């Protein structure tokens, strides 16, 4: 086990995606993260935080000290909030372009900071979450050494269509597309091997 990505619980309610609302935290709590790290045997290596959650900028150095790399995502934060989190130690952006406020010319928000600053950006390479041209844009803006192909997959990865679980949520997979009963996309069924094949197809490499 290389490590666990703890995607939450300090995430925006507005941009939570398929995350259950009642499990989100609306104030950063370093002690809770310390408990998670202890319970995992020290295997939490990466976490996603929304910069607008009160206390998150101050939490970042404390998590880094626990050996946890901090990313930002599932967020509606503005440019200044996101830039402050990068200054505090954020090193990556979780599935850029999905479950977040998008670029606007008057406030580039998390998307603008992701492309401007020296951070890694994740791209879900299933052809559903991002248009292939968007993935090429990331590569052109960031370079191959700063773009990370990810799956965002759930337990249905590589399995037939049907009914599955995502934590406490029921998920329906049709034509390989995973969604909650209300139609909200719930991760993917992508395997890492297929993500890399897709990335090569998107880029012509």
Task: Give the label of every model feature segment.
Residues 109-123, 140-151, 156-205:
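His/Asp/Glu-enriched, well-ordered alpha-helical/loop segment
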Residues 11, 20, 76, 155, ...:
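Short, flexible micro-motifs
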Residues 31-159:
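Active-site core of metal-dependent hydrolases
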Residues 25, 94-99, 169-174:
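A polyampholytic, Gly/Pro-enriched intrinsically disordered region
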Residues 1-43:
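Divalent-metal coordination cores built from histidine and acidic residues
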Residues 25-28, 126-130, 184-191:
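Catalytic cores of large soluble enzymes that bind and process phosphate-bearing ligands
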